[in-house]
């Protein structure tokens, strides 16, 4: 059939219409999947908002065996939001009752972190400034993020985080609009954490880095701390980001970040309010994994 256009390229709309579904899911049982460690992320986009906080308040949120890292009299805590993709290599048709049905999952989560180290190794703690630490200066790898709370919107990721990494992990929901290769023109990071499948907000955040200069940071490998409540021992794992972070000093541009508390009754919100209080953010870091495929726009092949 002859083309109705005399040009080389088909008309491509600026927006397309896609279906919207209301999806509900009830647990019908359980299944087994490989307890894979290391756990591999196929793709990730992440942002950290860092705060100087009161060491005494931070220490009160740490479990037995961990103590807060102190930088020039302050502790360092962060709100870490991520969009991630994991491929499990196991799938089943459609909306099957066996998870993970599509062979993978896209999950979004918040980690509320306090930089800490094992009490048993406190004497070996490096003397660093916050700026040195965020640039990747801790070569001892004793300093790491204790995950006070992890709030995730994927039930499989919640179960795996608890079983494999002893995370204090809960199921929540998210709405967000963040920079991405397929979200052209979006420069602001904006996200809201809700109590699971409700409109009750836990917290919301907006980060606008426009006009701010970024420095490269070699943060990996990143140490994550959790706690084995049964053994009453701290647990560590090492997370490698295969790339460079972008690090922003916002100590003189604190209006770049806005975080608002919701009305949730979850203990997570109570702890966030106690930890961060009215503290102003001092730094932001971002990381995005490289794009692996790009399919260019269409053109008429008969020219």
Describe the residue ranges of each PLM region:
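N-terminal ordered "arm"
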Residues: 33-80
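A generic "folded-domain core" signal
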Residues: 7-21, 26-29, 64-116, 284
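Functionally constrained cores in energy, signaling, and assembly domains
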Residues: 58, 116, 266
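Aromatic- and glycine-enriched beta-alpha-beta binding-site module
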Residues: 87-199
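Surface-exposed beta-strand edges and their flanking turn/coil or helix-capping segments
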Residues: 62-64, 94, 163, 206
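Interaction-surface and assembly-scaffold signal
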Residues: 3-32, 150-303
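Arginine residue identity/basic-tract feature
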Residues: 52, 64, 80, 121, ...
């Amino acid at each position: 059939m002859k083309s109705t256009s005399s040009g080389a390229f088909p008309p491509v709309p600026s927006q397309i219409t896609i279906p919207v579904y209301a999806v509900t899911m009830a647990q019908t049982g359980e299944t087994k999947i490989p307890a894979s460690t290391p756990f591999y992320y196929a793709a990730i986009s992440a942002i950290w908002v860092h705060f100087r906080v009161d060491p005494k308040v931070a220490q009160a949120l740490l479990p037995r065996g961990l103590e807060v890292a102190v930088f020039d009299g302050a502790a360092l805590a962060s709100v870490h939001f991520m969009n991630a993709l994991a491929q499990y290599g196991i799938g089943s048709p459609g909306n099957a009752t066996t998870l993970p049905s599509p062979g993978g999952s896209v999950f979004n989560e918040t980690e509320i972190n306090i930089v800490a180290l094992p009490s048993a190794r406190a004497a070996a703690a490096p003397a660093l400034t916050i700026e040195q630490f965020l640039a990747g200066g801790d070569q001892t790898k004793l300093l790491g993020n204790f995950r006070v709370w992890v709030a995730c919107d994927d039930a499989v990721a919640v179960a795996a985080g608890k079983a494999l990494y002893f995370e204090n992990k809960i199921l929540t929901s998210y709405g967000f609009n963040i920079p991405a290769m397929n979200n052209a023109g979006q420069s602001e990071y904006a996200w809201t954490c809700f109590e699971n499948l409700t409109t009750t907000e836990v917290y919301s955040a907006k980060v606008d880095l426009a006009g701010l200069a970024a420095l490269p940071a070699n943060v990996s490998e990143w140490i994550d701390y959790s706690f084995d409540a049964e053994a009453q021992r701290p647990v560590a794992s090492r997370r490698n980001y295969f790339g460079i972070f972008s690090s922003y000093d916002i100590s003189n541009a604190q209006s770049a970040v806005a975080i608002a508390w919701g009305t949730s009754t979850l203990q997570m919100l109570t702890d966030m309010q106690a930890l961060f209080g009215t503290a102003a953010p001092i730094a932001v870091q971002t990381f995005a994994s490289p794009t692996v495929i790009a399919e260019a726009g269409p053109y008429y092949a008969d020219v």
